[in-house]
């Protein structure tokens, strides 16, 4: 198919990547421009409506305009039903996005992926040239910004068929783009969920569990969903906690302990009846059991402070260490946490050369001092 300048094709591909040393089986959104053969990609943890819209929005803003027409396959992310006469029922979120940016859409016939052959080829090209070997980075958001620059630089080569550079042909694409809207489009999804007695809720057909706060137990909560985060919000639309969005078709849980620890610190007597006690790490339960009842509120308050400062995992590690020393006081807890989380590295023992003489240890006999002190005391009495 011949495409006029300004049109684009869209498709997802499979990709692996390491973020902070953790391997992810993710997806990457490809947008290709058949006229010039310019292409762009964005990496994501999965393939959903938030990934699609965030990726398109990022690419539109980077290239400074909106393609006149976008070609898609019949992905469930967009298409809810294919009608007999060839038209499609589309998701409400995508229709609002399309209306906001003003582009037209074309959907390929079922089993006819060749109708968007340019982007099919670009999916493979991007994988071979930008995702092999498996990329490693610290933060996905920043890496996606780097990918846009790399894709732009990739246009500085000759077109496979036309006697010109891709970057120059892409200027013709740009001349036909629609202008970016004056107002920004919110790509996040907003949903109302019902929390259980522990102030937690489920997404993805009950597979993914997220916490809110004991304050929001057995109630309805508005949640904001992006490709990266799940964010429960209060009645004033303020963020309560922020979870990294869970991906995968298996049971997972994301627990933010800070609101629960703060609540328990105010009512330590309800610790074992709250339901939260049962899901605490075993060492933390043992530690709290050893504490005096009168000290539990203060201990929980300190654990909450340590969690806020360096995360629950580090706070739990601190509890495990002080438990080894059978120390259940607040000062030991704070001191151990400072030791474990200090940026000052603990130096190993210094090794001495064999030529340096070894001194025998000197033992001090304090009994003579005791005798002298007793005699001195007698003389003054």
Could you describe each region identified by the protein language model?
Residues 230-381:
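Protein C-terminal end segments and domain termini
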Residues 42-69, 90, 247-251:
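Active-site beta-loop-alpha junctions of metal-dependent nucleic acid enzymes
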Residues 1-17, 82, 89, 167-174:
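Basic, flexible linker segments flanking DNA-binding modules
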Residues 66-86:
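Acidic/histidine-rich, metal-coordinating catalytic segments
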């Amino acid at each position: 198919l011949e495409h006029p300048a300004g049109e684009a094709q869209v498709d997802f591909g499979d990709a692996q990547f390491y973020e902070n040393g953790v391997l992810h089986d993710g997806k990457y959104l490809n947008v290709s421009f058949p006229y010039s053969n310019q292409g762009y990609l964005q990496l994501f943890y999965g393939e959903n409506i938030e990934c699609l819209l965030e990726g398109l929005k990022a690419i539109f803003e980077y290239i400074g305009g909106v393609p006149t027409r976008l070609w898609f396959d019949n992905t469930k992310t967009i298409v809810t039903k294919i009608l007999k006469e060839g038209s499609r029922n589309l998701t409400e979120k995508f229709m609002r996005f399309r209306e906001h940016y003003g582009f037209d859409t074309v959907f390929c016939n079922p089993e006819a992926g060749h109708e968007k052959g340019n982007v099919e080829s670009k999916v493979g090209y991007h994988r071979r040239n930008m995702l092999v070997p498996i990329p490693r980075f610290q933060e996905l958001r920043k890496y996606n910004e780097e990918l846009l620059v790399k894709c732009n630089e990739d246009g500085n080569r000759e077109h496979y068929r036309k006697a010109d550079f891709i970057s120059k042909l892409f200027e013709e694409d740009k001349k036909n783009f629609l202008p970016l809207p004056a107002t920004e489009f919110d790509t996040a999804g907003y949903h109302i969920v019902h929390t259980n007695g522990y102030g937690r809720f489920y997404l993805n057909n009950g597979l993914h569990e997220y916490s809110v706060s004991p304050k929001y137990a057995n109630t309805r909560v508005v949640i904001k969903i992006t490709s990266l985060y799940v964010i429960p919000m209060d009645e004033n639309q303020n963020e309560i906690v922020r979870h990294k969005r869970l991906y995968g078709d298996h049971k997972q849980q994301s627990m933010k302990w800070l609101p629960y620890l703060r609540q328990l610190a105010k009512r330590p007597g309800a610790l074992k009846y709250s339901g939260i006690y049962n899901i605490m790490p075993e060492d933390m339960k043992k530690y709290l059991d050893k504490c005096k009842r009168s000290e539990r509120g203060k201990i929980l308050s300190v654990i909450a402070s340590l969690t806020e400062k360096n995360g629950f995992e580090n706070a739990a590690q601190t509890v495990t260490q002080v438990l080894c020393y059978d120390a259940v006081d607040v000062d030991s807890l704070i001191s151990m946490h400072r030791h474990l989380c200090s940026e000052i590295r603990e130096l190993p023992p210094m090794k001495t050369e064999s030529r340096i003489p070894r001194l025998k240890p000197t033992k001090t006999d304090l009994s003579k001092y005791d005798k002298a002190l007793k005699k001195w005391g007698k003389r003054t009495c």
